[in-house]
Curated annotation (Swiss-Prot):
Mediates Rho signaling to activate NF-kappa-B and may confer increased resistance to apoptosis to cells in gastric tumorigenesis. May play a novel role in the organization of septin structures. Residues 518-564 are annotated as: Disordered. Abundantly expressed in brain and kidney. Weakly expressed in lung, testis, skeletal muscle, heart and thymus. Keywords: Apoptosis, Coiled coil, GTP-binding, Methylation, Nucleotide-binding, Phosphoprotein. This is Rhotekin. One of its GO terms (cellular component) is cytosol. Coiled coil: none annotated.
Length: 564
């Protein structure tokens, strides 16, 4: 009998909406069972969604130009990957539906019995030439604009990006040092290369533009008219309205625009430097326009997996051309376009030289047979190659029909891979593994002398000299005599050695009521400690009595030449 306290029983009304949801859920689980590949793709999709949320938060919080550019770039890359992963998941689900229902795709093409092996595709030495005007590059005229550019590369659902490069008119081409590697590429791949750019406004370039504009207008229009124009500009700025003749600043960070793109296929693969055409998508009126020449130079290499990984191995008895004996018992390894024959299987693992090698190329002919007079090795596999007018045949003897079938399938798969990858199977192209990318480093800004001064009033002289010594980068001598004018203790003579210096006076100790000294990160002295006391900072060298008066600008020593 049904009891409310009985937790092991659940009743659902027949035909209710809840029952239909349960049935629909069971149908989905049984009909769309996710494969490990789909699970991995879903995990990547979830990761990119979290990365996009983090990039949005970072873009809303960052205040530096470099941070905003990197956050915007990350947001664009994450959005591209999310769209790519969602499209791939949708395609796989549709294929599952067609397979379960027994329907064929719209093109009604029979599925191939053999699918070509995948390979590694690497693009490196990327350079995009620029085409500046003569007045901009040679005569160095006009405003100096800067662009932040990067490349987005895609093969299927795999999307990679390069580091961001700052470009101005001092550069003749855009150079990317990254080696972009795609580990899972098919022979019919299409590598789409997209160049994105954003115009970078210099910080502080427009900060004083309203006041400078008002000053120029007031001086050019005369005293009376200029005063009225200046007053109107000041009132507009004080009322909170946008300054006249100045655009409203953009909200949401910088915007990257698609400047050019191209598509590279297997035909463009070459073990060398090559130039490809670019399709330009921006015009000169675009704020992110960059004077591109219309081409990209790069090295595109490909490594099919059949060329770098063994596809078959096992015990063989090889009878070479011209031999009348039963053959030599070897361990054969099919790798690339060669069948390597070793004495033992351990020799292949340790990388020793093979006993001999049988070449297998596109012109090789393979024929299977059976020998009645060899009961231990009854099955044969003949491999024939032509060298000019001569034909050389090597015969492989195998123990079982299953071994013969495995070697035949491996050879037919190799022939099929060579027909799909074509010239990439002639020789193994060199591909360097990309180095781990370092995080972008923001440009260090040196604080002014005002922000680096100490806060305690009794310690100002020591703080200033300490900062100047840190900027100069040299070890300064003991305190000069003029420092005694600001203290109660007489200055030490110049002949005193460091060992005879008296202990640190009481006034040099940190004050209990004062705020701690604050320095900028680039001017923090390395020898400051966090203990209760600190040593006297090195002071400037002594000066002659003549140098204690007024100085002209040309007589200042290097330790006083500090930007304020």
């Amino acid at each position: 009998m049904f009891s409310r306290n009985h937790r092991s029983r659940i009743t659902v009304a027949r035909g209710s909406a809840l029952e239909m949801e349960f049935k629909r859920g069971r149908f989905r689980l049984s009909f769309f069972s996710e494969s490990p590949e789909d699970t991995e793709l879903q995990r990547k999709l979830d990761h990119e969604i979290r990365m996009r949320d983090g990039a949005c938060k970072l873009l809303a919080a960052c205040s530096q130009r470099e941070q905003a550019l990197e956050a915007t770039k990350s947001l664009l890359v994450c959005n591209s990957r999310i769209l790519s992963y969602m499209g791939e998941l949708q395609r796989r689900k549709e294929a599952q539906v067609l397979e379960k229902t027994g329907r064929r795709p719209s093109d009604s093409v029979q599925p191939a019995q053999h699918s070509p092996c995948r390979g590694r595709v690497c693009i490196s030495d990327l350079r995009i030439p620029l085409m500046w005007k003569d007045t901009e590059y040679f005569k160095n005229k006009g405003d100096l604009h800067r662009w932040a550019v990067f490349l987005l590369l895609q093969i299927g659902e795999q999307i990679q990006d390069t580091e961001m490069v700052l470009v101005d008119r001092t550069l003749t081409d855009i150079s990317f040092q990254n080696n972009v590697l795609f580990a899972e590429a098919e022979p019919d791949f299409e590598l789409r290369l997209e160049l994105y750019g954003a115009c970078v406004e210099e910080e502080g370039a427009l900060a004083g533009a309203p006041k400078r504009l008002a000053t120029k207008l007031s001086s050019s229009l005369g005293r009376s008219s200029g005063k009225r124009v200046r007053a109107s500009l000041d009132s507009a700025g004080a009322s909170g309205n946008s300054p006249v003749l100045l655009p409203t600043p953009a909200v949401g960070g910088p915007r990257f625009h698609l400047l050019a793109h191209t598509t590279l296929t297997l035909e463009e693969v070459q073990d060398g430097f090559r130039t490809h055409d670019l399709t330009l998508t921006s015009h000169e009126e675009n704020p992110a326009w960059l004077p591109l020449y219309g081409s990209v130079c790069c090295r595109l290499a490909a490594q099919p997996l059949c060329m770098i990984q063994p596809t078959a191995s096992g015990a063989l008895r090889v009878q070479q051309a011209g031999e009348l004996q039963n053959g030599t018992l070897v361990h054969g390894v099919l790798k690339g376009t060669n069948l390597f024959c070793y004495w033992r299987s351990e020799d292949a693992d340790t990388g020793q030289e093979p006993l001999f090698t049988i070449v297998i190329n596109k012109e090789t002919r393979v024929r299977a047979g059976e020998l009645e007079q060899a009961p231990e090795w009854p099955f044969t596999l003949s491999i024939s190659n032509k060298y000019g007018d001569d034909e050389v045949t090597n015969t492989l003897q195998l123990e079982s029909r299953e071994a013969l079938q495995n070697w035949m399938e491996a050879l037919w798969q190799l022939f099929f891979d060579m027909s799909q990858w074509r010239h990439c199977c002639d020789e193994v192209m060199k591909i360097e593994t990309p180095a781990p990318r370092k995080p972008p480093q923001a440009l260090a800004k040196q604080g002014s002398l005002y922000h680096e001064m100490a806060i305690e009033p009794l310690d100002d002289i020591a703080a200033v000299t300490d900062i100047l010594a840190q900027r100069e980068g040299t070890r300064l001598e003991p305190s000069p005599p003029w420092l005694a004018m600001f203290t109660d203790q007489p200055a030490l003579p110049s002949s005193c050695s460091p060992a005879s210096v008296a202990p640190v006076p009481t006034w040099m100790q940190p004050l209990p009521w004062g705020r701690p000294r604050t320095f900028s990160l680039d001017a923090a002295p390395a020898d400051h400690s966090l203990g209760p006391s600190r040593s006297v900072a090195p002071l400037p060298p002594q000066r002659s009595p003549k140098s204690r008066g007024f100085y002209s600008k040309s007589q200042l020593g290097p330790w006083l030449q500090s930007p304020v």
